[in-house]
Amino acid sequence: VIGLCMGLAGAIWAELPVPAFTLAWRHSIEKIRWEEDYRVAAEGLLLGEARVKGSGAGMEIPADAELHEGSWHYRRQLPPLQPLRLGRTPEAGDYQLCFDQRCHPMSDWLGPPQASQPALELWSCELGSPLSPVDKGQGDG
């Protein structure tokens, strides 16, 4: 079963059996909520729609974004992300993972953000497998 792994440098800190999720956060300066929808596929995380309530420093809304119900909606064409790299620090606040119509702070699985560990990676993985994004597809397969 393919699911979502969270960790760093191939070390798995948490696994979630979800086929899709929304990654949400508040811009560290503007305090504006951003959301990105992802599908979990064998080849990586596939970005779907993104939404934002307004622009923030260093994170401009694309020119083709459309305003619906107070949020800008847009899509970016990216190859599968394997892994998706995130900065995660106490100063910026935590990310949320939303699935099954509920949002959860990443600290539910990983503990609070720490200055000593300012990065996080998300990737699709075979649940219960020790394979990292680097060695995925190699081995006795």
Whereabouts are the PLM-identified features?
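Mature, soluble, non-transmembrane domains
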Residues: E60-G141
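N-terminal secretory signal peptides
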Residues: A11-P62
